[in-house]
Amino acid sequence: LYAPTIGASMADILTGKVSPSGRTVDTFAADASASPAAQNFGDYAYYDENGNITKYNYVTYEEGIYVGYRYYETRYEDTVLGQGNAGDYDYAKEVIYPFGYGLSYTSFDWSDFKADWSGDTCTAQVTVTNTGDVSGKDVVEVYVQSPYTDYDKTNGVEKPAVELVGYGKTAELA
């Protein structure tokens, strides 16, 4: 985001000249330092053969696939289903704004959802109708849930509860 342009854009949104249609690109947690990704955060230095600190640093990534929304959605599912080591977890207290969250000055209705499979490829289609009083754009996000099979469990395969596989934004709808 180029700072000098934010003023005009923000003014257009606040005055209603433009209806906001963006979505959050990450999960906004109440305490970001409590996420698995933050547990390994730090400035770890490499040492040379004499034990002296070098100018090179590293980070150890141990959270696997459970970063961003995948962590929060999977932990929520584990809590609901009583599986794994999710423990006592309250999604509403942990997540302030979920991945893909957004506001608009109008409202939309989705209908006529279709999913067509051709081999391993799925094409999803939905009709989006503006039901509000002002023009705006909407974002449709498509998530899938993969079965967690006995093979996955036996072999330690990690799968998130849900995964974003596609999205699209409508044109301006009156």
Indicate where each model-derived feature is located:
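Intrinsically disordered, low-complexity Pro/Gly/Ser/Thr-rich segments with frequent PxxP/GP/PP motifs
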Residues: 140, 151-174
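Secreted, periplasmic, or luminal enzymes acting at the cell surface/secretory milieu
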Residues: 1-137, 143-145, 151-153
